[in-house]
Amino acid sequence: MARPRISISMICLLILIVGFVLQSSQARKVLVPYGTSKGLFLSALPKGNVPPSGPSDKGHTSPPDDTDQRMVPENSPEIYRRLESVPSPGVGH
């Protein structure tokens, strides 16, 4: 009678495939409780009234009115000089 030969490489391939299938099926069965993610998020939030971040009791203030005058207008040539591309230091000599 002729016996079929199974090579070692076929056995290794079969073990490898079975291992991947078992790992992937086990990974799908991991249960995450519904309230866990909400509890972590809510515990990171501050409780009660949040004090102002500045040293004064005024709280948050608006920026000064002259900020618009200090900004560079869009049609100014200065903006083109600032946005020019510069070659990297590795190029050239």
UniProtKB/Swiss-Prot annotation:
| Similarity comment: family membership | Belongs to the C-terminally encoded plant signaling peptide (CEP) family.
Gene name, per UniProt, is CEP13
* SUBUNIT field: Interacts with CEP receptors (e.g. CEPR1 and CEPR2).
Which keywords annotate this record? Apoplast, Developmental protein, Hormone, Hydroxylation, Secreted, Signal
**InterPro entries (alphabetical):** CEP13/CEP14
Q: What is this protein called?
A: Precursor of CEP13
Which residues carry the post-translational modification Hydroxyproline, per the record?
P87, P89
Known function: Extracellular signaling peptide that may regulate primary root growth rate and systemic nitrogen (N)-demand signaling.
Residue ranges the record assigns to the propeptide? 28-78
Extract the ranges annotated as region (Disordered): 45-93
Q: Which GO terms describe its molecular function?
A: hormone activity
* BP GO terms, sorted: cellular response to nitrogen starvation; nitrate import; regulation of root development; response to ammonium ion; response to gibberellin; response to nitrate starvation; response to nitrogen compound; response to osmotic stress
- Summarize the PTM comment: The mature small signaling peptide is generated by proteolytic processing of the longer precursor.
Induction (free text)? Induced by gibberellic acid (GA) but repressed by nitrogen (N). Accumulates in roots in response to nitrate and ammonium chloride NH(4)Cl depletion and to osmotic stress (e.g. mannitol). Repressed in shoots by nitrogen starvation.
Q: Which GO terms describe its cellular component?
A: apoplast
Q: Where does the signal sequence lie?
A: 1-27
